Regions:
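Solvent-exposed loop/turn and edge beta-strand elements of beta-rich ligand-binding domains
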Residues: 1-342
């Protein structure tokens, strides 16, 4: 008798009782990704485990059932009285934004109503990709005539869940997208067209801002700036979610990449012997015409730092008493790969 409702009416002649069969229908839900290009084939996202409450009113106070999705985004089917219901997500699935919209749906007797919904994937709106610093000073200011501008980095994005700080390429995985970026005068690269040299299309938020999906990003320097040696280290940055359903996550940790100065050591010794001579002053003229004076230490050594690309000269300016100045000029060059040739 649970499928029937009894009604009682009264008049002057008699009491009237009748029974009507309740009108039932069914309801289920189909969940899809609002951005399948980002989520399909990416184990950081799953449509399984989303929970939607089914309510009698738009205020969503009287719940009559729950709908829970499987890995294909299909929910269980519930039987309810015919009428209008309001469906709202109470738990977002892995990697997706909680859908706060209230969805009205009408259930017709004897039929199954299917509500189709879409969830946005969580994204990380990265601003600064990386920053370069001088290894000696730990600052984003170059030494001498060196520059932090013009370094190039290859950035790769992998559709995969992080495994600690392991490079996905070591696991045989292929990057989904990759780009080459160039640093500005502050040694920074930003995820935008101004710093892009070449590469694939950017991932974008619904408002058009550049972003990364959940997964793994690797950063590697592929061209050093003037005056520095290339840093071969591959920096692995996991982009993860705590699955709280928030629209954006901020787990991209901008790497600070240290740069080692390109240097040339010069040692002044007594002719025919290995005796070092201290106090010898040299004039170094770099490829841009800038000059500096450097003096040998007690080991007869002087170090030229931050060598720019092009031709350089070294010439003795003065020597200690008892020594004769060498009139010769030493020339050396630095090529585009920061290789020194004497």
């Amino acid at each position: 008798m649970s499928q029937y409702t009894a009604y009682v009416a009264y008049n002057n002649a008699q009491d009237i009782v009748w029974i009507e069969k309740d009108q039932k229908g069914s309801l289920n839900l189909k969940k899809e990704s609002a951005n399948p290009e980002v989520t399909e084939g990416n184990s950081c996202y799953s449509r399984e485990g989303a929970i939607y409450g089914v309510y009698k009113e738009q205020a969503c106070t009287t719940k009559v059932a729950d709908l829970t999705t499987d890995a294909q985004g299909n929910s269980n089917t519930v039987e309810v009285d015919a009428g209008t219901y309001y469906v709202k997500e109470t738990k977002a699935p892995k990697g997706f934004v909680l859908d706060k919209q209230v969805h009205p749906v009408t259930v017709t007797a004897g039929k199954t109503a299917v509500l189709k919904v879409k969830d946005l994937p969580q994204l990380d709106p990265v601003g600064v990709l990386l920053g370069k610093i001088d290894k000696e000073t730990n600052q984003n200011k170059p030494q001498g005539s060196a520059s932090l501008e013009g370094a190039e980095f290859t950035v790769k994005y992998y559709k995969t869940e992080p495994t600690g700080t392991q490079d996905p390429a070591e696991q045989g995985k292929v990057a989904e997208r990759q780009w080459i970026f160039r640093t500005n005068e502050k040694g920074q690269c930003k995820l935008n067209q101004d710093h892009l040299v070449s590469g694939d299309e950017f991932y974008l938020t619904p408002t058009g801002a550049t972003t990364f999906p959940l997964g793994v990003v690797t950063v590697q320097e592929t061209k050093a700036p003037e005056g520095y040696i290339i840093n071969p280290e591959i920096f692995v940055i996991p982009i993860t979610s705590n699955n709280d359903g928030s629209e954006f996550i901020y787990t991209y940790n901008e790497p600070k990449i240290p740069e080692t100065l390109l240097t040339l050591d010069i040692v002044k010794v007594l002719k025919g012997k290995d005796t070092p001579i201290s106090g010898v002053v040299f004039t170094h003229t770099d490829s841009k015409g800038n000059q500096e004076e450097v003096t040998t230490d007690e080991k007869g050594q002087v170090v030229l730092k931050g060598l720019t690309r092009g031709t350089h000269t070294i010439q003795e300016k003065s020597v200690p008493d008892g020594y004769t100045k060498n009139p010769g000029v030493l020339k050396f060059s630095v090529d585009e790969n920061n290789k020194i040739t004497l």
